[in-house]
Swiss-Prot record:
L-methionine binds at E55, Q98, D251, K282. Binds 2 divalent ions per subunit. It is an enzyme of class 2 (transferase). This is S-adenosylmethionine synthase. GO terms for cellular component: cytoplasm. GO terms for biological process: one-carbon metabolic process; S-adenosylmethionine biosynthetic process. SUPFAM superfamilies: S-adenosylmethionine synthetase (SSF55973). InterPro entries: ADOMET_SYNTHASE_CS (IPR022631), S-AdoMet_synt_C (IPR022630), S-AdoMet_synt_central (IPR022629), S-AdoMet_synt_N (IPR022628), S-AdoMet_synthetase (IPR002133), S-AdoMet_synthetase_sfam (IPR022636). ATP binds at H14, D164, S165, K166, K242, F243, D251, R257, K258, A274, K278. Homotetramer; dimer of dimers. Pfam families: S-AdoMet_synt_C, S-AdoMet_synt_M, S-AdoMet_synt_N. Gene3D superfamilies: 3.30.300.10.
């Protein structure tokens, strides 16, 4: 019998995502000026206020208030009517030095002996149902909001959009786990109060989302996904009605509260650790990226159409306590999942320092991860500029989303004799 699966996304202007982006912007600035910085930055945003907290060990000092304000303005919170704007909000910093007890357990004279920054389990997932090896419902949900943000910034076809928005997509699957049709799409978008008649205002918003936004999204998708769109899709557009009050004025936002949006939309699994604001010594982040890298390369190499990788660590310990692989009963090799995991250990070095080196994680690459998902994006090289009142301006060339590279496919094929 066919079944339904749903995933959601939230925009860069969602309160929790504002917090994530501020935390990762702070992390990037610390790493830009001191690549060995140890950082754990948390952010809370609410009406007219930003609170920064956490622990840092670094040889650089930053104007953290201005970094936070720049992020808020970049997102689009620039008007007093929003009750939260980069130029006028208060920014309180409670950031202090990292605990010596934690530092001594993680840091080693020999980098290869670097211990894990915490205990825990991390997961990486990949599926061949999309070109970027991501779950389809989540991929479409992200694309809806990315395009909505473009429309907001363009300010031409839809002029009333504000930064806060959410999306959700429900897809019907066959018994063979093949997507057959899109059943429902939910879009909630903050907007200006542009009409005294609330019913007329909502009617226009619905019309614009269905007739302007959705066709723009659909054009970006491969033909087999476009065919899933149909005349029977149920659209829920701003289903509560008016959505003028939004952003941090409508709901407080915190770093690390959108971990499913950040990863696989409910597919696969999640170990519970959030990513944003954490330097790569925190395996919550680095090992989750490395596990995605493994899963994606395994699927791309043809080991299985869908793969889940789990890795676990003990704080201060160099080697993982476990590595496992789950192929959902669709393994294309003659090996058991346990045997596949043993080969994975031979191919991928999962010591924290090796992950950092392999994926180039000690670079300022994290602000771009903090909205619309940490996984599934195209690896690319960019030039970034950072400025400190104490050290001046520097330029850094970095590579983003290295864990999305298919650079181990040949090694996997050789190891599993899939050539």
């Amino acid at each position: 019998m066919a079944y339904l699966f749903t995933s959601e996304s939230v925009s860069e202007g969602h309160p929790d995502k504002i917090a994530d982006q501020i935390s990762d912007a702070l992390l990037d600035n610390f790493l830009a000026f001191d690549g060995e910085s140890k950082v754990a930055c948390e952010t809370m945003v609410t009406t007219g206020q930003v609170v920064l907290a956490g622990e840092v060990r670094s040889n650089t000092y930053l104007d953290v208030q201005n970094i936070a304000r720049d992020v808020i303005n970049d997102i689009g919170y620039t008007k007093g009517a929003y009750k939260f704007s980069g130029d006028s909000c208060g920014v309180i910093s409670l950031i202090h030095e990292q605990s010596q007890d934690i530092y001594q357990g993680v840091d080693r004279g020999n980098k290869e002996e670097q211990g894990a920054g915490d205990q825990g389990m991390m997961f990486g997932y990949a599926t061949n149902e999309t070109e970027n090896y991501m779950p389809l419902a989540l991929d479409i949900s992200h694309k809806i909001l990315i395009e909505l943000a473009k429309l907001r910034r363009e300010g031409k076809e839809i002029e009333y959009l504000r930064p806060d928005s959410k999306s959700q997509v429900t897809i019907e699957y066959s018994d063979e786990n093949v997507p057959e049709r899109i059943v429902a799409i939910v879009v909630s978008t903050q907007h200006d109060d542009f009409d005294a008649d609330d019913e007329k205002m909502l009617t226009k918003i619905k019309k614009d989302i269905i007739e302007i936004l959705i066709p723009r999204v659909k054009k970006q998708l491969p033909e087999y996904v476009q065919k899933l769109f149909n005349d029977d899709i149920v659209y829920h557009i701003n289903p509560t009605g008016k959505f003028v009050i939004g952003g941090p004025h409508g709901d407080a936002g915190l770093t690390g509260r959108k971990i499913i949006v950040d990863t696989y939309g409910g597919k696969g699994a999640h170990g519970g650790g959030a990513f944003s604001g954490k330097d790569p010594s925190k395996v919550d982040r680095s090992a989750a990226y490395a596990s995605r890298h493994i899963a994606k390369n395994l699927v791309a190499a043809g080991v299985a159409p869908e793969i889940l990788v789990q890795v676990s660590y003990a704080i201060g310990v160099v080697e993982p306590t476990s590595i496992s692989v789950y192929t959902y009963g669709k393994n294309n090799t003659d090996l058991s999942d346990g045997q596949i995991a043993e080969k994975v250990k031979e191919i991928f070095d999962m010591r924290p320092s090796s992950i950092e080196d392999r994926l180039k994680l000690r670079n300022p690459i994290y602000r771009e991860t903090a909205a619309y998902g940490h996984m599934g994006k195209e690896p690319r090289k960019v030039t970034k500029i950072f400025e400190s009142p104490y050290k001046g301006k520097i330029t850094r060339e970095v590579e983003l989303f290295t864990w999305e590279k298919l650079d181990y496919v040949d090694k996997v094929k050789d190891a599993f004799e899939l050539n």
